[in-house]
Structure formats: structure tokens, C-alpha cells
Amino acid sequence: LDIGSRHDQKLALAVEYLEYLGTNEYTADQISTEFYKLACNYGVSTGGEQSYVYLNGLASEFDEAVKLFEHLLQNAVADEDKLKQMVAQKLKSRNDAKLNKGAIMGRLRNYALYGEENPSTYFLSEKELAEISGEELTLYIHNLSNYKHKIWYSGPLELSELDAKLSAVHTIP
């Protein structure tokens, strides 16, 4: 996807939140179990300028895996308790980093290279984290497919067959 955390800091948080979510039909554990049954896995990560979404698995389970992944992205349901736990862990990690010599040196290096406004200071504040809602983050997840993106495929399907299968469940903007 041609969007990253430098475009919107909440996107990275939403992507991290996805792994804790279920849908209107499945709990988070059931989603995990379904992907396991299909011998597939997925992931979403956010860099500064781009985000990456991947789905790995067996060719024989391609249709079902894509369908399940699309279902997860389009129907993820907010879980405020999981969000609170995730935010608490993020704040704890930040506090722990204040005691880590390597992290301190990295922040100091960024300050020396870039000045007061640098990559080490570009994150959501504690107040912003406390105010964010699960509903707001799930909107980011629901909209992932709406961003301009490219699809890379490695497998036995011919391009025409792949296009037909993906077109049935996925829209490319």
C-alpha cells in the first residue's frame, strides 16, 4: 500500500490492533484456528512510507484463504478491552526504553542527525493513545483495501485464473 506511518500515525496502531480482533462471525481465536486449518498465515506491517499485507499458504487453499482474509479486513470488530491492553503494553515499552542504553543512544543519534523533530519523536502521545477508540482503528482496517496497492503472487495459477479468482472477492481501487 502506498501509505505508511509517516502519512498517518494511527495506521500503524490499527495494523497492530488487527491481530487481536475477531469479526462479526468469528472470534480472534476462531480466525486464527481457521487460518491454521487452511495451513495459511497472514500479516500486515507498516513502514514510514508504505504498508505491506501478505497472505501465505497452500495453492489448494487459495480461494478459502483469500475469502477468509478479505472477511477479516472488511468485518473486523472493535474490542475495547484488547485495545486497552495493547495501549498499556505500548506505554510500558516506551517507559522501558527510557532505561535502555541502546534505545537512549538511538534517540540521541536521531536528535543529532535530524534535530528536535526526528523519527524518534514521531509517535502518538500518551493522551492520543488514551483517546483513540477501537471503532476508529477498525475503520482503518476496513479501508486498507481502498488504498492504491499492488498484488504480487507466486504460485501455480496463470495470470488470467488469478485475476478471475481475486476479482470475485477483492476490489483493486
Predicted regions and their residues:
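M16 family metallopeptidases and their MPP-like homologs
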Residues: 1-19, 23-75, 86-95, 100-128, ...
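A common structural junction motif
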Residues: 71-80, 167-173
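An aromatic/glycine/proline-enriched structural segment found at the starts
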Residues: 120, 147-173
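Short, charged, amphipathic alpha-helices and their helix-cap/turn boundaries
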Residues: 129-133
